[in-house]
Amino acid sequence: MATLTTLADRLRSELGDLAKSFVWQTTADGTTNRFLVPYSPIDGATLLVTVDGEDVSTSVDVEETTGYITFDVTPDTDASIIVVGKYFRYFTDAEICQFVNDAFAQHTANHADAYGRGITLLNLPGLEEYPVVIYASTLALYTLATDAAFDIDITA
């Protein structure tokens, strides 16, 4: 029985996009409420943000792709801000899940099980899990290649 989580984990493993932990600390200036965490993409779901030792994670907006965090309330001058979490090399969890969902939908289109029921993640045969992950890897790698194509500096 496949789940989105297990397929997403296998995709991350295939891509070498495994989570790494980080701790980042800064001091507030009393006027800035938006900070760039020097790690991205970050996992916003598990991010812990403290201001002077108080957990304010629920009152912080996280831009997972860019690594920016925005406080609802500007931290006081000289307040210690500590951010603890996980970051990835290439993709956010949402992007990984989208690749898996797209690959699954395309892999199982117009297919049914032995009883004529549509294929779902729950009844996906174990033999079919790896092809879905490989197809999702292909989609992810095409995305990276397309992104890299825009990074080429052609000025001579």
Name these PLM-found stretches.
Residues 152-154:
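Short, surface-exposed beta-strand/strand-loop-strand elements in extracellular ectodomains
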